[in-house]
């Protein structure tokens, strides 16, 4: 999970770093600002019944990107398919294309007419969601975990999400993954006939693999982002010092970016502390909503779990 980025670009007292856009800029102010380490003070109240602090959920700040605060929910909303399909399409394992993914339609607005999953999380409703091969479904209830009100919905930015693919993941570090995610490489000529894209404009998605990689402490972790050598002491240092490992609790959770190995392959964060590629999209794993805020201000709190930052709505 390590990075070739210089450690001098970090503020260790605050567990903040400048990622220098994966090393593509030398500007001191040109990169994204990220929280890293085992337990940074990056907790924030969000999805509140009344702002700034009444009946809120705990979320965590990944960092600041293009001037917008990027948040991830501090916990899964349940385990569901990233996508699934009928048996004749990719053997029922789904299509790794976020712009039409089943879970994307659960998380975002304007899919109310879909009989399964359609905007249920965004509208705090219950119904059925996909959770297995061959369009298998399960009941799902977001009445207490979904987006609570119009005030919160207006705080969520429409943002251009990047998910360029990569096939040489075993040799890549966090900064290299970040650059590839912002690239245009996609799965070429898929047998399912669905054109793949490398960007999507919308409100709610899933964390990037690079987010997970950059969340560790590079002074203690030098492995690459997909290292699976569990006999290596450094491997344990990576997971032990990565706050994003804990947002899923004991649940493996889905990431945003597909991979280049097969038509149904998507990246997964594994609770042992590393990432797995080529996981079938139809499998049911944790879903952790991730989003960007409009121009919100953190106006109180210190970011600790007991005194989270509060947003001025």
Annotate each language-model stretch with its function.
Residues 3, 8-313:
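Long, domain-scale functional regions
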């Amino acid at each position: 999970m390590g990075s070739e980025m210089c450690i001098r670009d970090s503020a260790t007292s605050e567990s903040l770093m400048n990622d220098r856009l994966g090393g593509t800029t030398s500007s001191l102010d040109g990169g994204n600002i990220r929280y890293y380490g085992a337990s940074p003070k990056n907790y924030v109240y969000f999805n509140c019944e009344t702002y700034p602090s009444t009946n809120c959920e705990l979320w965590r700040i990944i960092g600041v990107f293009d001037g917008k605060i990027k948040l991830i929910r501090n916990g899964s909303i349940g385990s569901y398919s990233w996508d699934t399909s009928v048996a004749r399409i990719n053997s029922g394992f789904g299509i790794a294309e976020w712009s039409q993914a089943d879970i994307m339609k659960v998380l975002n607005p304007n899919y109310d007419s879909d009989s399964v999953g359609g905007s249920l999380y965004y509208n705090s409703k219950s119904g059925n969601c996909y959770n297995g091969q061959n369009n298998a479904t399960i009941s799902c209830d977001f009445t207490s975990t979904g987006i609570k009100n119009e005030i919160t919905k207006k705080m969520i930015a429409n943002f251009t999400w990047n998910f360029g693919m990569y096939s040489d993941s075993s040799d890549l570090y966090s900064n290299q993954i970040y650059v590839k995610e912002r690239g245009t490489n996609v799965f070429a000529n898929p047998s399912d006939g669905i054109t793949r894209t490398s960007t999507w404009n919308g409100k709610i998605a899933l964390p990037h693999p690079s987010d997970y990689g950059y969340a560790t402490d590079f002074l203690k972790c030098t492995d690459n982002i997909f290292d699976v050598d569990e006999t290596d002491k450094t491997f344990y240092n990576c997971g032990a010092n990565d706050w994003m490992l804990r947002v899923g609790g004991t649940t493996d959770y889905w990431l945003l970016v597909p991979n280049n190995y097969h038509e149904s392959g998507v990246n997964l964060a594994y609770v042992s502390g590393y990432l797995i590629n080529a996981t079938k999209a139809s499998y049911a794993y944790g879903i952790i909503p991730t989003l960007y805020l409009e121009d919100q201000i953190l106006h109180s709190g210190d970011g600790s779990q007991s005194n989270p930052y509060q947003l001025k709505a």
